[in-house]
């Protein structure tokens, strides 16, 4: 069983208690904030699960969370279970049975928990079915990632696969069209691509982009057109920003097609 961690932040803590309250064992609330409109419902949720609620000073919560960004609440809870290759297979089988188009987000070597959290948040907002990451060289779902995700970490299925390239082959064999973002001569503008069917979108780190083997597995490479400004131009975006732009285009097309 995974060791309990200290999660923090109003939305992250509320999501854990709402989605999997039995995984939590203790709640710390900053002294003087018990009756805050955002904190009182959290205490009420904790009470329904018989979770110990302790009042503590701000500095004590900062020490527990290892961050001053706790917003007055810290929750001791087991980390959310992460899916594996078998869960991905089950997801694909379920999608075929339902005949519902799926939208998957694949993150290749995203090691910053802040970027992972931001991507999870955007994925929930844009209707992503699941987020897939490799088992190695990727950020885990840390309390910091959960805080940045503002509750999305407990809403979005996260699947960790042993080998990302092999998982991509599996997706393609199951009829999923795989797009990868890259600055490449063969890449097409994002808006020129059909993102309305069973689609997987692969995002790489802002430093190195997607790996060569990952790029080779993609059905089509795409890029986000950037025009720059009078002040100059840049060649890349933060991965969470780029992910938001890519997922928005997918969401826009799928809404227009009434998917």
Please report, for each region that a protein language model flagged, where it lies by residue.
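Structured adenosyl-cofactor binding patch, chiefly the S-adenosyl-L-methionine
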Residues: 140, 147-152, 216-259
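Short, hinge-like loop/turn segments at secondary-structure boundaries
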Residues: 70-74, 147-152, 196-199
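Short glycine-rich anion-binding loops that position phosphate/pyrophosphate groups of nucleotides
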Residues: 33, 79-81, 184-186, 206-208
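N-terminal positively charged helical leader segments and presequences
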Residues: 1-94
């Amino acid at each position: 069983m995974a060791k309990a961690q200290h999660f923090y932040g109003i939305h992250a803590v509320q999501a854990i208690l709402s989605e999997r309250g039995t995984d939590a064992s203790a709640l710390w609330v900053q002294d003087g904030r018990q009756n805050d409109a955002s904190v009182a419902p959290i205490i009420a949720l904790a009470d329904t699960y018989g979770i110990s609620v302790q009042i503590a000073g701000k500095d004590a919560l900062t020490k527990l969370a290892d961050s001053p960004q706790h917003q007055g609440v810290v929750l001791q809870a087991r980390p959310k279970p992460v899916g594996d290759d078998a869960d991905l297979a089950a997801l694909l089988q379920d999608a075929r049975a339902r005949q519902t188009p799926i939208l998957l987000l694949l993150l290749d070597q995203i090691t910053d928990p802040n970027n992972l959290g931001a991507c999870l948040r955007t994925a929930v907002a844009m209707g992503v079915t699941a987020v897939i990451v490799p088992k190695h060289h990727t950020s885990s779902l840390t309390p910091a990632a959960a805080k940045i995700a503002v509750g999305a970490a407990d809403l979005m299925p996260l699947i960790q696969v042993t080998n990302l390239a092999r998982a991509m082959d599996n997706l393609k064999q199951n009829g999923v069209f795989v797009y990868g973002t890259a600055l490449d001569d063969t890449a097409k503008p994002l808006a020129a691509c059909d993102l309305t069917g069973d689609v997987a979108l692969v995002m790489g780190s802002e430093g190195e982009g997607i790996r060569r083997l990952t790029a080779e597995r993609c059905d089509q490479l795409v890029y986000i057109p950037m025009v720059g400004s009078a002040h100059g131009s840049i060649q890349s975006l933060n991965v969470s920003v780029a992910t938001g732009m890519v997922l928005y285009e997918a969401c826009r097309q799928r809404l227009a097609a009434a998917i």
